[in-house]
UniProtKB/Swiss-Prot annotation:
Pfam families: RNase_HII (PF01351). Signal peptide: none annotated. The keyword Oxidoreductase does not apply. Keywords: Cytoplasm, Endonuclease, Hydrolase, Manganese, Metal-binding, Nuclease. This is Ribonuclease HII. Its main location: cytoplasm. One of its GO terms (cellular component) is cytoplasm. Its EC number is 3.1.26.4. The gene is rnhB. Manganese or magnesium. Binds 1 divalent metal ion per monomer in the absence of substrate. May bind a second metal ion after substrate binding. PANTHER family: RIBONUCLEASE H2 SUBUNIT A (PTHR10954), RIBONUCLEASE HII (PTHR10954:SF18). Belongs to the RNase HII family. It comes from Salmonella paratyphi B (strain ATCC BAA-1250 / SPB7). It catalyses: Endonucleolytic cleavage to 5'-phosphomonoester.
């Protein structure tokens, strides 16, 4: 992996999203400005960490970061805008929520939302940029907790296990029970369950 070279600036925010692929719930984003004086050991792409390690780092990031913020776009916004535009909106909300304005924003992936400060997309940024790794951890822990809470209300769907992704089990239960108010109606498997497409 090519080592990432940081822009010449001090207050760098990292941004990442979780939940573009699921059929249910919000897409959740986070923005994080780390404190160079309080390094956090072990930051990595949230998907490469155990749940226990993510939870430990989640608390440490919130305690040590200069600023952090969560953003989101709800299922109905995803349906209205489409998943790409809703993700960009959620990223804008995360950056806007930082109580310290960043001088530069690094975003995981290959495109940036419109922001009032300079920004750059970083492919595989969640593995290459500590700020993006931290954002990916905050976003994933937050969204996983939301899926666990939804699982209590709708235990038949198994949200705590698959986090809303279109697993065979989820698709089976969607066909059996229909869609909840939290499902994304613009996504093809949900449309099929609702009888909106053949």
């Amino acid at each position: 992996m090519i080592e990432f070279v940081y822009p010449h600036t001090h207050l760098v925010a990292g941004v990442d999203e979780v939940g573009r692929g699921p059929l249910v719930g919000a897409v959740v984003t986070a923005a994080v400005i780390l404190d160079p004086a309080r390094p956090i050991v072990g930051l990595n792409d949230s998907k490469k960490l155990s749940e226990k390690r993510r939870l430990s780092l989640y608390d440490e990031i919130k305690e040590k970061a200069l600023s952090w913020s969560l953003g989101r776009a709800e299922a109905h916004e995803i349906d209205e805008l489409n998943i790409l535009h809703a993700t960009m909106l959620a990223m804008q909300r995360a950056v806007a929520g930082l109580h310290i304005a960043p001088e530069y924003v690094l975003i995981d992936g290959n495109r940036c939302p419109a922001l009032p400060v300079p920004s750059m997309a970083v492919v595989k940024g969640d593995s290459r940029v500590a700020e993006i790794s931290a954002a990916s951890i905050l976003a994933k822990v937050t969204r996983d907790a939301e899926m666990a809470a939804l699982d209590i209300v709708f235990p038949q769907y198994g949200f705590a296990q698959h986090k809303g992704y279109p697993t065979a089990f989820h698709l089976e239960k969607l066909a059996q029970y229909g869609a909840t108010a939290h499902h994304r109606r613009s996504f093809a498997p949900v449309k099929r369950a609702l009888g909106l497409v053949s």
